[in-house]
């Protein structure tokens, strides 16, 4: 198989993301907080993306210049940073309810600014200009207004049926053409047309992923 012409830059970006999130310990942070708060709701079980696998997933969502990306339940921001660094988005936003994960995500944003400033000049300018497009919101994705989304990612593996149904009903009011990336679960609704399905690598192993487009 012929190697992609952009592979060297993909590899560079992946390495930068790995260095940025080294020592992140997001899963342990989530476990400690949930245990301390005696939170037994399985919806908050923590899982993460694989950087290159998520790049492949996003490519199948057909991102356009200036698109707006949301990660619903964004943890410490891996999917948000991956979307922002690999693609030319106008906004990459993570919505996270748990305070320590939200705090870590914002700390990552500060760390990224400093980290990018120490890269070679050509890479420094490429990645520093992405920083203003990245933001994190502490809120419930069922409450927050993300109507400006063009692409949404949901790790739906542990969501309850009632939460999932509420979220689908909310997303059904989004603009035509909005793409919804879903890990594990499916959407049964007249407005959602499936445009991709495959098995992709996540932190917990191989996972079915579907991408829908709103009619």
Where are the language model's segments positioned?
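Conserved SAM-binding motif I beta-strand of class I
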Residues: 91-96
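Conserved SAM-binding loop of SAM-dependent methyltransferases across substrates and taxa
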Residues: 78-89
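A short SAM/SAH-binding and catalytic strip from SAM-dependent methyltransferases
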Residues: 150-162
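C-terminal substrate-binding/active-site "lid" region of AdoMet-derived donor-dependent transferases
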Residues: 159-215
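Conserved short alpha-helix immediately C-terminal to the canonical SAM/SAH-binding motif I
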Residues: 79, 100-101
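Conserved class I S-adenosyl-L-methionine
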Residues: 66-75
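S-adenosyl-L-methionine
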Residues: 1-65, 104-146
């Amino acid at each position: 198989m012929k190697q992609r012409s952009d592979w060297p830059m993909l590899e560079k970006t992946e390495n930068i993301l790995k260095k940025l999130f080294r020592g992140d310990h997001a899963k342990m942070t989530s476990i400690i907080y949930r245990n301390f708060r005696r939170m037994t709701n399985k919806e908050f079980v923590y899982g993460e993306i694989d950087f290159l696998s998520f790049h492949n997933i996003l490519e199948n969502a057909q991102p356009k210049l200036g698109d707006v990306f949301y990660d619903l339940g964004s943890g410490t921001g891996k999917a948000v940073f991956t979307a922002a660094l690999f693609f030319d988005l106008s906004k990459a936003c993570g919505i996270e309810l748990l305070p320590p994960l939200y705090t870590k995500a914002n700390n990552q944003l500060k760390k990224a600014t400093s980290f990018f400033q120490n890269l070679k000049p050509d890479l420094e300018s490429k990645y520093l200009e992405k920083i203003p497009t990245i933001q994190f919101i502490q809120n419930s994705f069922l409450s927050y207004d993300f109507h400006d989304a063009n692409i949404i990612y949901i790790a739906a593996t542990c969501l309850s049926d009632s939460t999932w149904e509420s979220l689908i009903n909310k997303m059904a009011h989004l603009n035509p053409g909005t793409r919804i990336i879903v890990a594990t679960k499916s959407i049964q609704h007249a407005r959602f047309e499936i445009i991709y399905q495959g098995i992709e690598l996540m932190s917990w192993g191989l996972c079915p992923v579907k991408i829908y487009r709103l009619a």
